[in-house]
Amino acid sequence: MPVETKTDESRQIAQYWDAIAPEFDAIYTGKKNFVSRGLDRLLRKDMYQRFEWVMRKADELRPATVCDVGCGSGRFVSSLAKRGTQVTGVDFAPQMLTLARQLTESEGVASRCKFELSDVLDWKTNESFDMVIAIGFWDYVADPLPRLQVIRKLTKQTFLSAWPRAGTMRMAIRKVRLKAAGCPVYFWERKQVENYLQQAGFRVQSCEILGQLYCFEAKSV
């Protein structure tokens, strides 16, 4: 287990996700009342779309190994493992990893999954992966480049990432809501993201707009 060197901001974010882990996971399980499920489908449609996008790319590219950076409660990890992939999930929120381990055990894929409690910036590993994904991650990163540079070293072939778009109606709402909860949040222009990816050593293959998100497929250069 690596020694963590959390900044005050990353500690705030980890504490936020620890506190809401079961509530967040319920977005995927649907274990909510009828009204809440309906609101999720309406207001968080792109969360389901980004999941489908990653699985579609995985089915096309068929990676043998995947690293999920900011894996949260393990929904992507478990679904990728069901496809026969060896998956490593990295997250710095302990309660999220507890849920992720429970999920992979309950779905019978734990033997193909492992988890690391760490900020990817602090993770000490010699491993690399056919595909790396970072979904629902860049919302909470003030300076993407250092983490992108680490991710580039982890990536043999393909990197998939989803970035919240600047200038949307949801941006203002999320800023207010998350500030009240003590969690910083960030939004991005497409050109900014392209520049960061290129600086880190990736070549952008495609960018799809899914609701409030930019979803980038990039290749290691």
Identify the function of each model-found stretch.
Residues P164-P184:
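Short, glycine-/aromatic-enriched active-site segment of Class I SAM-dependent methyltransferases
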Residues K156-P164:
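Conserved beta-strand signature within the Rossmann-like core of class I S-adenosyl-L-methionine
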Residues M131-A142:
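A short SAM/SAH-binding and catalytic strip from SAM-dependent methyltransferases
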Residues V141-I151:
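A short, conserved alpha-helix within the catalytic core of class I
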Residues P2-E60:
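Conserved class I S-adenosyl-L-methionine
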Residues D122-E127:
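Short conserved loop adjoining the S-adenosyl-L-methionine
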Residues P184-A200:
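Short alpha-helix
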Residues C67, S73-V120:
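Class I SAM-dependent methyltransferase SAM/SAH-binding core
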